[in-house]
Amino acid sequence: MLVLKKQDLTGRDVFEFKKGRYDGLHWNEDSIYVTEEMFAEAGLLQWFIRAFGFFHYYGPTEVTEREWKTFKSIVDECGSDLARQLVREIDEWAATCFKVHDRFTICGI
């Protein structure tokens, strides 16, 4: 697995994918985490900037379901195999998020 759960964290810098709007709380049990190294290796920063025009590397970025679909399409078309695999894993989590919330938040490192 390319994404981590809270219990899998080993002290590296991570991006937290958190359900709903940013509320200032971190390290949630139902969040998923991507290490900074994996984020960079998969090239996610360039794909977020291409899809949204911005990405807050050190702060929160809220992503709506519509924006997520746009992002997935770009990665499916242009991303590496690693990027596509990572996005598929995030998407499994996002699907459960969007059943209850209209967005998720990526908390920067």
How would you name each of these model-derived features?
Residues 1-105, 109:
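Acidic (Asp/Glu-rich) sequence patches and key acidic residues
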